[in-house]
Amino acid sequence: MQKVLITGSRIASPAAESPSPLQILSSADIAASGATNLQELLQKNPTMGTPTVSRTNSNFLTSSAGVTTVNLRNLGDSRTLVLVNGRRFVSGVPGDSAVDLNSIPTDFIDRVELLTGGASATYGSDAVAGVVNIILKKNFNGVLLDALAGKSQEGDDYKKKIALTFGITSADGASNLMGHFGYSKQGAVASRDRERSALDQTSAIRQGHPELAFVARRPNFSGYAPQGRFFGDSEDFTYDANNNIIPWNQNGAPGSGTGATGFNRSDYRLIAVPVDRYLFATTGNWAFNPEHGAFFEGTYASSHAASNIEPFALGSDNVYKPDGQVPAASLINGALVRNPLVPQYLYDRIGDNDGDGVPDYFFTRRLSEFGPRRSVVDRDTFRLATGLKGTLRGWNYETYLTYGKTKEAQSSTGQVNVMSLRNALEAIPDVDGTPVCRDVHARQEGCVPIKLFGYNSITPDALKYVTAPGSLLTIITQRLAGGSVSGEVPGLPAGAIGVAAGVEWRSEESSAIPDPLTQSGLNAGNATPPTMGEFTVREVFVETRVPLLKARPWVRELSALATFRHGDYSTVGATNSWNAGLEWSMTPDVKLRATRAQSTRAPNINELYQAPSQDFPTGLVDPCEGVSSSGSGALAVNCRNAPGVAVNMAAHGGVFTLNQADQQGISGYNRGNPKLAAETGRSTTVGLIVTPRAIPLLRRAVFTLDYFKIKIADAIVFTDRQYALDQCYNQNNPQFCAFITRRPAAVGNLSAGSIRYSDIAATNSGGFGTEGVDLTASWSGRVGPGSLSARLAHTWLRELWQQATPDADKNHDAGEVTANNVNAPRNRATLNLAYKWGPYGASWTSTYTGPVSLDDQFLKSLSIAPGTVSVGSRTYNDVQFTYDVRKAIQLYLGVDNLFNAKPPPIISGLPGNQTGTETDTSTYDAIGRRFYVGLRVSL
């Protein structure tokens, strides 16, 4: 009997059944979906959680626009390991392990195996939630052409695809060479082209009023408008279309918006970003002789994506930090010289706010002259794997080398150079009254005064001077080497012992380098330095399958399974993963399986080495405030030992005292932590497989029922600032004191001992967990004149929780859509039906997403009882019809979202909202009914 290798084990066995829960999507499933990207199909599977990055949620990301990732069990993309032919694939996200599915040619895939549950012992780090193993086609002979075109009912979201796959096999059938070329194009979907998102809006929900959650306040325009908003001492004003001064009226007349002076950002935003892809792939198997051979896999993917959001919103505090006073005049040789570009109306209504002898003002303005903020991303991924495999004295062996590289070049427009803008804002009249920049050196460098007052007031020369094009260059490199052997050791009465063992080496490097202005925080944003890092790991593993009993009453077969992997990381040192399980075949029709596993995830490069990026937190409470010099508790002692606190106490009668400026003067940095340890996950799965061959009607049916539970107690999270403060001073935990920097002495109006920096860094202080049941059922057979196949997959989620810190209460997310964009319905299901009758074929896919409540923490903050505000369930139906013109030619027509089911109104301000879409586009279809037609030709 031929033995096969299935995801979840490295030991080939006669039965293609995994010891852990496994679901398989075939190439026929991919073809019936009409999907141009694998994520579109995978997200229909109920084991999948909310992806961190997709085409419909990445418009506002600073990088990774158009990337598509997967997230098993809602435990995070970084805890789902994506493999290609059982081997790792280079990441598509800098500093992370998440694979961009755009880089894998959909039409070159034979099947996708979804293994849920911890699998780090078998495959290494990151497989805490499970594994997505993408198996490419092999031994294909001939030519296959597939082309399609389609668009949405609204005339957008157009897509085009052409894919050519070819293969040739040697005369003896032992060697094969395959190639693939693919091109796909998916168009943009603009927020303004869907009624629900055409206007800026926000939820009307407020304290104690749950009934207002899905009532939209429209319009809810931005206070940063293209004509500017200017603040005097007692009023604020703006300009009309003719640049006449008028009062500010942000949203206009209630209900109609008439006379609004605010800005509608939805005119510029996208629901889905456009993505173009070119894909090249090749595989080959060359048999030296019947026992030994070589193989190779090559992939090159080039993708182009573009995000688009509203023009830059500039506030005077972006230019003059921290308070934002803009000088309306200059002191030159002791004389006050007015800026000639400042209107008299404003000049007459301002005073000296900061005591420097110069009148100043404040403003907000939308820099519409700059155009929209647009990021164009070109991403190239290359991967080559090669190796030897064969059989030696009854044992199978394989060795391989893999090299992968992802390069992303991003260029951005619409940003402003803060230093240039500051020079341009500080204008004085020259000898003939013409406005010039005050700073002589700036004038020599081409400074042009800028006028912000009114529509289109910025001249092309001024625009050129203050514009700051942005860039980001990221490079990810992966190198792998490994070898393994597998075979059988005879000797037990119940059969031979299956054994597999191997060694692996891996190197990961990543860098993300923004432009110099972004690094320095001089483009009106926070400083974002480069992030670079690398690590290597050496691993050994061993797996065994031991037959315990065979051909006994109620025991057709009983086997024990065990796997152990030891890793040695250059960053975290030694790691150990293991799993142990039982497979009990009671009868030919009934089988039980159970697995207990410990999986590890080493910290990724971002978590270890993210460079400090500046932030300005609000709402922090200093535990030391009010502590006295005579206090004897741990808090008092810890506070007095902090720099500057004793000085502060001495100046305030022995009590540590802070003022408002101290609270507003806190800055901080978000950074990685090179001292992180690997996180450990424990998983349990217990399952039942039933194939009721004795029942005539069900003899071709397969049923599986699997219970799963996963818990991570030392998860890597970015520690909350308030938690770090409390741990340092209240809990006497010095590890967290390193995140806090105090002023040793008073600086201006900032007190001695006040917090200067409160940082966020990654720590092993979090926790995650999930628990539930998976059910699958499948059947195929003759029905009427044709053949029918049916498959159902359902997941019931009992529990999903996260814990910010070890002593914090668990935040239960099952059945909720949360503030951190996790959508976790208790029930999700997918039903696939396919019928074939002669040359005619039809397939139907129904995807059900159960109801969810709004995040209980969000509702509690509004004094609303948890569970009282819910989003209803949604069912999406996709169909495809095929007609075989002849044996080699097939036409097909498909409709996605057949009944045009609308997404729920998850309005801005509610948890789960994706900016610019007024719903959760990671979960629900925000585009609507879509059509496509295609042609397949095989030769």
Regions from the language model: what does each represent?
Residues 798, 847-858, 882-939:
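C-terminal beta-signal and adjacent terminal beta-strands/loops
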